[in-house]
Amino acid sequence: MPAPQPFLPLLFVFVLIHLTSETNLLPDPGSHPGMCPNELSPHLWVDAQSTCERECTGDQDCAASEKCCTNVCGLQSCVAARFPSGGPAVPETAASCEGFQCPQQGSDCDIWDGQPVCRCRDRCEKEPSFTCASDGLTYYNRCYMDAEACLRGLHLHVVPCKHILSWPPSSPGPPETTARPTPGAAPMPPALYNSPSPQAVHVGGTASLHCDVSGRPPPAVTWEKQSHQRENLIMRPDQMYGNVVVTSIGQLVLYNAQLEDAGLYTCTARNAAGLLRADFPLSVLQRATTQDRDPGIPALAECQADTQACVGPPTPHHVLWRFDPQRGSCMTFPALRCDGAARGFETYEACQQACVRGPGDVCALPAVQGPCQGWEPRWAYSPLLQQCHPFVYSGCEGNSNNFETRESCEDACPVPRTPPCRACRLKSKLALSLCRSDFAIVGRLTEVLEEPEAAGGIARVALDDVLKDDKMGLKFLGTKYLEVTLSGMDWACPCPNVTAVDGPLVIMGEVREGVAVLDANSYVRAASEKRVKKIVELLEKKACELLNRFQD
């Protein structure tokens, strides 16, 4: 029968086309399974989660669970692969993170559409445990440091915290001798340009909270919304979180506001010199206002938490403001309706007016620089670090957490007080200490790094003069700064106490394996003119040689 003969070539062509189309669906050699976010949906572009730093040219440059995708910088970055709900078949066996390793610091295994993937941690504990990291920044706690390391694709480790002592002095000098500081003169902790002010928007409206901060180096800004949960979500610049966007300049914009969006939004700004946290209260109001409060009825009862049992669940997606004794200010709580009434306030300002008596604690306010140009050195108290720190005040629109001297700041605010330490006793007087020491210098302390676990630390000294140097060649090398190792230090009451004097010091110590070392027997005193002159005279008269001959 001749009829079937033409059918065979057609069947062969159909099978060939089918096989070709099937092979096109297979991934290219070296490519990883899954899709890029914008391939799955045109609205899911790779955002700044990659920070445009993890560049790649193909999937082979990324981890097995990642794809090389176009990012907002016009380049390509490694990001977690996405899978459509009706896409590649998922193995019938349940996916598990068991045995799946996430080598990047701050990343955890998560199951994404049936596959284990590594995701950067985006929630951290609310309790502070300040951590100094190897990138020179201070983090709110260890979790924040790990999350930042994952975000930047780095490895960060904990280092001893630095104490910057070079500027400003504890008290300004006379006006005629004090130079006007500039914001870029020295490392400065973050400070706000303007004090945070409460905002209120109607349902469906847009709110903008701007954490406008100064500091040197420029501070990094993150946001979080305070909640009653153990962990808060960290919101970073150039990312979207539901109806919330954090811009590249640290501005939080909330679109289509809903009642549940009301609350305290906390800005955290940090740099190598310090850390700042400021609360921005946001109230969301219903357009159809409920019954107005009778102005003749005191609202103090509204400040207290509900003690009676309420029938039924809380009002869905509705929050009210009440006084929180732990914070000392107002915060949002789920609205509970008992007997048809809800206890609480619609706005943060109404709650503060009714429940907070007096001007409030000035020491709890963030440091505010202000927008003017009349720069002045000032001191502010940090309730997080529990210490006073310097900042530059512009001369206007600050707040009460603004002191002319460190002493006045410490007198007004709760700086931890420890019993006074006994004065460090010198094992030898000046002449004998000079002869027993390998070096004697005059210098100003610029930085101290404490290492309590090793009972030591490091002191960095700006050299004014080298009086004696038997082993390091400081004058020959023209050394301007000297790093001195502190050995056997009890940091509760350190001896010698290198931080006891603000001005120049006379420092004498040993040299061990080419390193300048101070221990409990080393000589450290204020560099008075009389003391320095005495050392020079002893060296000129070669008193140490005579002393050695006498001892021999």
From Swiss-Prot:
Residues 190-283 form the Ig-like C2-type domain. Its main location: secreted. Residues 1-25 form the signal peptide. Residues 112-163 form the Kazal-like domain. GO terms for molecular function: receptor antagonist activity; serine-type endopeptidase inhibitor activity; transforming growth factor beta binding. GO terms for cellular component: extracellular region. Coiled coil: none annotated. Gene3D superfamilies: 2.40.50.120, 3.30.60.30, Elafin-like, Immunoglobulins, Pancreatic trypsin inhibitor Kunitz domain. Disulfide bonds join C36-C69, C52-C73, C56-C68, C62-C78, C120-C150, C124-C143, C132-C161, C211-C267, C303-C355, C310-C338, C330-C351, C363-C413, C372-C396, C388-C409, C421-C493, C424-C495, C435-C544. Residues 413-544 form the NTR domain. Glycans are attached at N497. Keywords: Disulfide bond, Glycoprotein, Immunoglobulin domain, Metalloenzyme inhibitor, Metalloprotease inhibitor, Protease inhibitor, Repeat, Secreted, Serine protease inhibitor, Signal. SUPFAM superfamilies: BPTI-like, Elafin-like, Immunoglobulin, Kazal-type serine protease inhibitors, TIMP-like. Residues 289-355, 363-413 form the BPTI/Kunitz inhibitor domain. One of its GO terms (biological process) is negative regulation of proteolysis. The second BPTI/Kunitz inhibitor domain is able to inhibit trypsin. It has however no activity toward chymotrypsin, elastase, plasmin, pancreatic kallikrein, lung tryptase, plasma kallikrein, thrombin, urokinase or tissue plasminogen activator. This is WAP, Kazal, immunoglobulin, Kunitz and NTR domain-containing protein 1. It comes from Mus musculus. The gene is Wfikkn1.
